[in-house]
Amino acid sequence: MSNSNSKKPVANYAYRQQQDYNGMNAMVGNPMMYHPVDFVNGAGQYGPSQHPAYYTNSPLPNIPPTPFDTAYGASLFPSHLLMGSPFVSSPNMQSGYNSARSSNLKRKAYSRPVSNHNGYNGNSNSNQNNTNNGMVTPSNYYRMGRNSFSRNNNSTRNVTHNNNKGCDTRNNSGRRTFARNNIFDDILPEMLLQRPFCINYKVLPTGDDAYRTRSLLIENVDHSIDLHSIVKNFVKSNTLESAYLIEGGKSDDSKDVETKNLSILISFLTKGDCLNFYNNILQRLSEFKTFLKSEALNLKFVCLNYDPKCLPTFIESEALTENAEEADITNGSTMISASLHHNIANKDATRSIIIEFKSPVEKSDLFKKKLQFLDRSKNKRYILESIDLVNTDVPSNQFPENYAVLTFLNISMAIEVLDYLKKYSKNLGISKCFYVSLAPLVVSSARSSVANIYEGKTSTHRLSVPSVTAGNNNDSNNNGNNNKSNMSGITTLNNNSSIGVSVYGHSNMSLTSLSSSVSLNEEIDMLATKLQGVELDGTYLEINYRDYQTPTIEEHSTHLSNVKISKTTENSRQFSQDIPSPLPLNEHMFMNDSNQSNGAIIPQQLIATPSPVSPNLQMNQRVLPNPITQSLEQNFNVSAKVASSMGSDIGNRTIYIGNINPRSKAEDICNVVRGGILQSIKYIPEKKICFVTFIEAPSAVQFYANSFIDPIVLHGNMLRVGWGHYSGPLPKLISLAVTIGASRNVYVSLPEFAFKEKFIHDPQYKKLHETLSLPDAEQLREDFSTYGDIEQINYLSDSHCCWINFMNISSAISLVEEMNKESTVQNESGEVTLKRATEEKFGGRYKGLLINYGKDRCGNINKNLIAGKNSRFYKKVKRPSYNIRLSKLEEKRRQNEIDEKEKAFDKPLNLESLGISLDAHKDNGGGETGTANNTGHENESELEAENENGNETGSFGGLGLAVASSDVKRATSDETDYEDIFNKSSGSSDSSSDVEVIMHSPSDPEYALKSQTLRSSSQTVINSKRPVKIEDEEEAVGMSQLNYRSSLRQAPPRAPSTLSYNHSKNNETPMQDIFTNGETANNRKKKRGSFARHRTIPGSDVMAQYLAQVQHSTFMYAANILGASAEDNTHPDE
């Protein structure tokens, strides 16, 4: 281990300390994150730890490292390796982070000593565990002041606490409440007013993007330039943290005569804001040089620090050594940045505050009667940049009749002045005071320095956590005498050592986002490495009021349109609780804690799913109880961001439309404008341009954005859409009228009793229908043109209603209010009656008619941008109802298929595809219908006898199949050929005597019955060697000759549409229904001769059809072979 007094790498040490402090501040705004405890010097001091933090929604907390871990001492100093180890000491959980500070600890400049005889902590506490723990977190520095931070016992519901302001308290519901401590509670205002602000800044090297900070120094500015004019014209004031003038600069272009010019030091809230301002200057450098009256304008990035000696709580102590004092100054600078960050992030603090007065205040009485403490004769600390005094007769929605807007040089001044006003408001006659944000009245495109930054919480939410300096007193040797200064003016200091600590330890310039607590490690390492060994000059500056002009008081008789209340201030009752401090801890981290019952252990289910009731889990969660307010705020932020990114001003409602066709009218332009109701339309036909002003700024932003998605074409010209001049705030009269439905459209209609058919039988219908009528369109235009220009009159064909569209909504409001105005009239009998203005104006033409607001068609939604049938971007979207219809259609289709299958099974079998024809013959008087032309037949005489007796059936071989008469002649002619074929293919007649021909599957009852009948007939013929006589005398079956050439030309059987059938009805089919008469068979033969009405079948059915074809070919081949064998058996002697 190295000696504790040895020098440490300054840059690496500053980087490590910054990571710790960034992590702690990130957890301040994260309600789901807990930070582990690091025990310092055995006193249980609560502070940043090298241990990684864990989240409560993780399955298990991280196990704290021990000295026996290999990487335990990687990030600790040698003197800290064994401190806080649970194996060396077993600290008490309750007293571990509430123990009193050790007597040997050096007092910090930002921490008052805890004693019973001082005036800073007058309330003594007998329990030493509840005294100050010595650590001030950034989030509670200004809130807690110099009071001790106590951690109370969690084992009881009623928490015992100190009575000092800012301490941990609980309300009736058990939730913690923290009251922000006023800095003027413990210090005299007269003493603080004589202590000016002081800053230190170092000019960083140029030529490298790594040296970019949030502070910029503008050199060689003319002495006549006013600071307020620069900020007003070039910078959005709510993005500035501070702005200072530096006297005594020497002009570079003057060699002989030393001419003193000014330098302006501007510090922004974020580094991004500063870079935007810097790039804007470079793009318009000539314009800036002309405005600032400087041809040798120079820009430099600087590292800005606040001197902790200007703190309200700073105490000079002779007991502190020089090194300890330097360390206290270093830490005090960090605490100023931390407290400033806290107020900006949680209170939306700005450089401007508003003071409301109960009565009108004259310009001369502002500093004499109301703000005496800001008079320059008594005040050296708070310097004003501008003052706006407003005295009106009517209050606005946000402000009263009498108020003043004060803008200071930096935000810290505004914070302290606001504390003073809140404490002495009764004596000063002040009703309210709060932060406000200022925006330029008219921001030109050339002077808009922060085009991509919008007002509101977006800038403050990107505020970064300030860096942390070395806390060890030994490291203060690196800074030697850097902070020694001369309070009377500006002193240049030479830093002979590395400034790694100065850049990251003394500065709040390296700010990281609250939303992302991850620092830019690569940039930090690179910058720290580059600055090692580089000597830079540091400048000490006292903010002296003599260097600034006396602020001019601008009086106004109307409300300021560029002043807006801070969003957090508007919802102050919802964000009354500050971030709790010290941070609540989870006691799972301490394995050897003997007093586990004193703390509340978070159950496993709460770790996985945090409960919104537990204050430990929800530390600073901002929840808006009103969803409407939250939605409006979100819409405003989004529209403001889009407008800023598109080059518009915040709240601009005017749209420019160019490239209009000469034959287009104002009516045509309104037909293509969609997205929001309009306030006015200003059409200039000579210039072919038009300016359209919406009621709401988000509507204008939406229309502007939609014009790029869906370009507008009017009369063949594609319209150019841009931003018009800033329209200013919406007048209060119009905003109130819009809430009750006002628009540019006014309708004039007959009463419903005069034209609706449902009242045709009403007695009033006939009377009103005959007496009331609408004037024609020309008369309407002549009468209502007195209120303003008319864009369009839409007159219905049935003449019971019409709509008048004005060019300005104010004209419509005036018309409706005047026509519906009622006055009291007293008749001769003394009765008082109400009389409407419509009965007297325009000759009584509108008496009895209804006149009210209609619907502005410009407020309709652009149908081209929604999923509809009329949209060019229409895409068919399947809805649940569509799926239901599909399922119903599919079910109906399946039912139809089942019905068709059942009908198909009811039809008789078609044997024609197998080469077998079934013909029914009836005996009409005898005669030979068939002749057995089989030469050499043993029983030829018997066949002839049977033919003569009416058995007109010809047998075919030993199969006993009847030959139809139509095929006898063809069979006779081919007999010789068949004999040759059969003799070659068959051996003996006995081999085929017992062969059964299976025509269908035995599993089918109907087809099994058919095949069984045929088999029995065949076996009878074969065994008896004679033809078979069918039992049915009236109907005979003739089977055609088996000609393989003709049978193979038949269409093969089609595969069934499915592999499963329902044959419940087929079993009931009688045997005689299988064979129909000749007429039916002939008709069926014509219908089923070909494949008609093909349909798509699945793959399984295709395979079944293929198998059926193979079976058909095999069957035909077997039938031919069997036929040859049977015929061969009939001639055994041959």
From Swiss-Prot:
One GO CC term, this protein: cytoplasm
Keyword annotations of the record: Acetylation, Cytoplasm, Phosphoprotein, RNA-binding
The protein's name in its UniProt record: RNA-binding protein NAB6
RRM domain mapped to chain residues: 653-726
Role played: RNA-binding protein that associates with mRNAs encoding cell wall proteins.
UniProt modified residues of type Phosphoserine: S464, S467
Phenotype reported upon loss of the gene: Displays increased sensitivity to some cell wall disrupting agents including sodium dodecyl sulfate (SDS) and calcofluor white (CFW).
Organism of provenance: Saccharomyces cerevisiae (strain ATCC 204508 / S288c)
Source domain of life: Eukaryota
The keyword RNA-binding belongs to this UniProt entry's keyword annotation: yes
